[in-house]
Amino acid sequence: MDTVETLEGKINRSDYKILIVDDVVSNVLLLKILLTNEKFQVCTANNGTACIEMARKEHPDLILLDVMMPDMNGFDTATVLKKEEGTKDIPIIFLTALNTPQDLVHGFQVGASDFLTKPFNKEELVMRVTQQISLVAAKRIIEKQNQELLATLTNRDKMYSVIAHDLRSPMA
């Protein structure tokens, strides 16, 4: 638990973008106000198709996705997002009035990272969003450390190659 608290303390929320997707304008506005007050960057879409386009264009760090929308529902939208290389790793929190075990299972099967049931509690929303953003931040740290480690290993191998060459052909 200390590691998560420490990581959350290091997170600059303004570095993270959240895509809010809901066909009900009042829900979008409420979520936008809540998350901008928490210092997150926010972009919005009002349907599944617009969500997919916005995710491709904006590369959000998290998507809050309504399930019950006309044309393309949230489950179908998530399925498309999880199949595309550029969007497959974006965590998705479903916002839904659906709360049966079958709905939850289906949501996780199509790629949900978490669920929030409508009507949602503000504090719970902020905590779940912060938790997902913490995981995104941790993943970024791990990826950066892996790149640094690979660079170190490459340099080490070059150094070993030079040493081996020098040992095979000493100066006269």
Regions found by a protein language model. Give the residues of each.
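Acidic catalytic/metal-coordinating carboxylates
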Residues: 26, 46-50, 73-79
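Active-site beta3 strand of CheY-like receiver
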Residues: 58-67
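Two-component/phosphorelay signaling modules centered on CheY-like receiver
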Residues: 25-43, 57
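The feature encodes the CheY-like receiver
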Residues: 28, 70-73, 88, 100, ...
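Short amphipathic alpha-helix used as the core "switch/output" element in two-component signaling
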Residues: 53, 75-88
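Non-catalytic signal-transmission and effector/linker regions of two-component phosphorelay proteins
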Residues: 1-19
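Primarily the dimerization/phosphotransfer
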Residues: 147-172
